[in-house]
């Protein structure tokens, strides 16, 4: 008996949407990365991108536990000398709420080309309106 290995041409991808209202950031990001990698499928293969497309709505209503709302700091660098910038979770959620989920999920995906292709299947929106209605996404309960 041989081990079954799926070909990239035979991968079937579905569209799902998740409502992030009152969800904990880390738990949601963990579940999203699990589905983006395709580990919920029986034909999961570590070296292929077998995951599904996921749309996250209401990213501005995500929750964090403890004092992270005040104390969590996001860093980025401009590329110039001394150009390290920081912003707190409260500032980030008010100005760019979709980036909070994107940063959390990106850290849980594999590093490299495969992880980048998985990350491209994540679509995050700060409110209920999204532009992927034509794909007929199904609700994913997380």
Swiss-Prot record:
Domain of life of the organism encoding this protein: Bacteria
Function according to Swiss-Prot or TrEMBL: This protein is one of the early assembly proteins of the 50S ribosomal subunit, although it is not seen to bind rRNA by itself. It is important during the early stages of 50S assembly.
GO BP annotations, alphabetical order: negative regulation of translation; translation
Keyword S-adenosyl-L-methionine: no
One MF term in the entry's GO annotations: mRNA binding
Subunit description: Part of the 50S ribosomal subunit.
Cross-referenced PANTHER family: LARGE RIBOSOMAL SUBUNIT PROTEIN UL13M, RIBOSOMAL PROTEIN L13
Family statement drawn from the similarity comment of this UniProt entry: Belongs to the universal ribosomal protein uL13 family.
Listed name of the protein: Large ribosomal subunit protein uL13
UniProt keyword Ribonucleoprotein present: yes
GO cellular component, one term: cytosolic large ribosomal subunit
